[in-house]
Amino acid sequence: PVFLADVKGDLAGTTLKGEENENVKNRISKLKIEDFEYKSFPVRFWDIFGIGGHPIRTTIDEVGPDILSMMLGLSEAQEGMLNIACKIAKDNNWKLDDTKDLRLLIQYVGDNKNDFITQYGNITTQTIGVIQRCRLALENQGADKCFGQPELDINDLIQTNEKGIINILHAVELFKSPDLYASFLLWLLTNLYSKMPEVGDLEKPKIVFFFDEAHLLFNGMPNYRLKQITQVVKLIND
């Protein structure tokens, strides 16, 4: 199985059998491949907006405050405030499915900050306001559509139909919001790492990821978060 992020909308051709041309012929000759055969492959399209493929949904709880902070474009101090809010929700067994739940949580924490400061740390009205504005901006990008139920099961990406299924993320619209695009790909990686069992060395990889414009994962990223991502990527590669 393969997962491809398609930011230009030009990878759908993998559903069709290829056609011969000079470039392909030269490549086959260079690689010394004998009895080469053009084939089509089973493809499944995904789109967090649900327009160019099956919708991909997750929950605020599943994404977690670290990646959610990336999506919101928060500073380190603001991320700390979001961590406090999420810890309060966890301690009270409050489920956070979508951005509406997030809005209500942040509002509640702000309105009752004096009840939480002693146990959880400083909570400022200014930071609460910044997080709410960033959440609203995220919703205006349409990102609220990727939060809610039912959430994606990572095993849905690891399916075969005689051949490994090619999962294509239709990311033409998503790529217009680079921070959201990068955060979403990072969530997929961390989800894969946390959900997949340790199996040791395999004859074939369980799934292959191709991230178009992957440098966006690291652009402008603070060092503390860059270390986290590097660790996840190394562990998955191992």
Spell out what each predicted region is.
Residues 2-5, 9-237:
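P-loop NTPase motor domains
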